[in-house]
């Protein structure tokens, strides 16, 4: 029997103020933790950001480290735009471009707590379990219908909207996941205690 996709869905929480592009014009290390608890919606579907990673052109794990290419060109542009790429030729990943024009820094959105449009997410993922719908960068892009068509789009105009968090959150930090270069940098940020993370933070991380 197919589980009911409506009765187990709570009303979405109230949204904060929309974030403007100026929010993203700061250091990637300020933007990344400040995004924890914010809400990302794409065509009205999305949720609370619970996990992100920061990337900067000065370190070798960043796509922008070796300079601009047709693929990463948007990272070298102004802040407040999306950078969408395909990972390993399989999954789409969404980043938010940060810092001033030319700095080539971005925040990878790694996990969401689903709050808006959950039935649509379940259809797209062919999965019912809410905890697993957006528990990874590729998973959340599939759930929100994100593709290369969403690359280089402004974060403050339809179909994308990002809303500031409405209360205090406890942010934990740790090393980034799935990389071999600059793997010791503690540039992963998450919502402490969230069950929607892509992977738990180690007890030694804080």
Curated annotation (Swiss-Prot):
Pfam families: Pur_DNA_glyco
EC number: 3.2.2.-
Phosphoprotein in keyword set: no
Gene Ontology biological process terms from the UniProt entry: base-excision repair
InterPro entries attached to this UniProt entry: Formyl_transferase-like_C_sf, MPG, MPG_sf
Alphabetical UniProt keywords: DNA damage, DNA repair, Hydrolase
Gene Ontology terms, MF aspect: alkylbase DNA N-glycosylase activity; DNA binding
Entry annotated with the keyword Phosphoprotein: no
Classification via NCBIfam families: 3mg, PRK00802.1-3
Family, as annotated: Belongs to the DNA glycosylase MPG family.
Protein name, entry field: Putative 3-methyladenine DNA glycosylase
């Amino acid at each position: 029997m197919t589980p009911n996709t409506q009765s187990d869905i709570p009303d979405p929480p109230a949204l904060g103020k929309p974030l403007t592009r100026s929010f993203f014009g700061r250091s990637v290390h300020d933007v990344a933790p400040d995004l924890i608890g914010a809400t990302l919606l794409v065509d009205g579907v999305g949720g609370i950001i619970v996990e992100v990673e920061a990337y900067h052109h000065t370190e070798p794990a960043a796509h922008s480290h070796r300079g601009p290419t047709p693929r990463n060109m948007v990272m070298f542009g102004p802040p407040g735009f999306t950078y969408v790429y395909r990972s390993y030729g399989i999954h789409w990943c969404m980043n938010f471009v940060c810092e001033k024009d030319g700095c080539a820094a971005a925040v990878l959105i790694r996990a969401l707590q689903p709050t808006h449009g959950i039935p649509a997410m379940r259809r797209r993922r062919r999965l019912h379990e809410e905890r697993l719908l957006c528990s990874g960068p590729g998973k959340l892009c599939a759930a929100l219908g994100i593709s290369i068509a969403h690359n280089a789009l402004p974060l403050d105009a339809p179909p994308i909207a990002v809303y500031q968090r409405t209360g205090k959150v406890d942010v934990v930090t740790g090393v980034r996941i799935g990389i071999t270069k600059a793997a010791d940098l503690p540039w992963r940020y998450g919502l402490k205690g969230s069950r929607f993370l892509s992977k738990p933070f180690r007890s030694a991380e804080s």
